[in-house]
Amino acid sequence: MVLALPDDAFLPFGPDGLSSGDTAWVLTSAALVLFMTPGLAFFYGGLSRQKSVLNMMMMSFGSLGLVSVIYVLWGYSMSFSNGHTGANDIGGIIADPFALFGLSQLLETKELADGATGFVLGGFGTVPAIVWVAFQLTFAVITVALISGAVAERMKFGTWMLFGGIWVTLVYFPLSHMVWGGGLLSASEGGIAAKLFGVDEEGAANVAPIDFAGGTVVHINAGMAALVLAVLLGKRAGFGKTAFRPHNIPFVMLGAAILWFGWFGFNVGSEGAADMIAGQVWINTTAATAAAMLSWLVVERIRDGHATSVGAASGVVAGLVAITPACGALTPIGSLILGAVAGVLSALAIGLKYKFGYDDSLDVVGVHLVAGLWGTVGIGLLAYSTEEPAGLFYGGDYKQLVVQIVIALVAVIFTGIMTVIIAFIVKPLGWRVTREDEDTGIDETEHAETAYELA
């Protein structure tokens, strides 16, 4: 069916050239990304044991409530306010948390730093500022929720909420600013990339770091925090001796399906416009995800003799993670390669927790940290461009690869150090349930509920 639209349906509107089409797409993308957090709750809930499924899902829903409030109050300001006010940030790490506190300033019609009333960061001049806030808020929410998979079945809910509030403030917002807000890991004149390889006539880095939708900010960040917590919190009783099997595999499959669906908002929405690049990102996201799912299943078949539904779901997530930073920089063939390698790497990496003795309960490290690192660094090999520096496999030199390795390492080091500090602040308050509570089930002891009442 062909839908007839008026000639001016997608023309810019407003004094600043804001686009109704772009605005509608970013709002839709924000809703899609928000839907990913309930999807993650199903994914993690299904992977958990029956006695802890509600707690696992509550950690995701708790993050949704807590981080949303914090982001409105000071989160956006800490990440992006310098782009609106023109003020300097603090050491390339953080913007002023009070400059846009509560966001009411973004509803005013007075001119901003560059004379516009719309969004003024990163070239998204066709989308109002408050719409971009909505989109960015959903990223912060799911990043915190992702970490919870590493502490499943043994961390107190209240302590988890306290940790999440501190962590998103001291780790997520600074890293978001560093990468996307003109900080140390951006293409700005004061960034690390500019110091390594110089700047062009406009003051931007000659070799710009590439993180299209959150390989560093979301996945390396969450994965590294998960590793720290898994090590410091300790193992579940019976780890390495008892098989902790998923209690509801249909939940896992449902969660993976919701995540895949929502990820189109995550990646395609990061373009900030309904244009050709958005189509490229959609295709690349699909290609990488499908390739990762298949390669994970091949690894399972060779290693274990079976291709499992949990493996398929995990492969989907690994592919989505890997393509996140690279989705706007690769060809479809490059995306297939990136995804296929991600599926293999993550399928092998999830076994490292048994070798090194850390209890990453739901494989946040093996999937998000490993695939996030590969996706970020793989850009230096597979990036395709006729104008900007390309990856090594497409005629480029070493520079893009070096920049990608540097931003990945900085993210790992920054998140690791800060998460250790936060963990030692929270730990004395009592962050782990007792052995008795763990045996009984954290659903009953923390929430006074059970998931299933079967006669």
Question: Which residues fall in each region the model found?
Answer:
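Glycine- and aromatic-enriched membrane alpha-helices
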Residues: 2-455
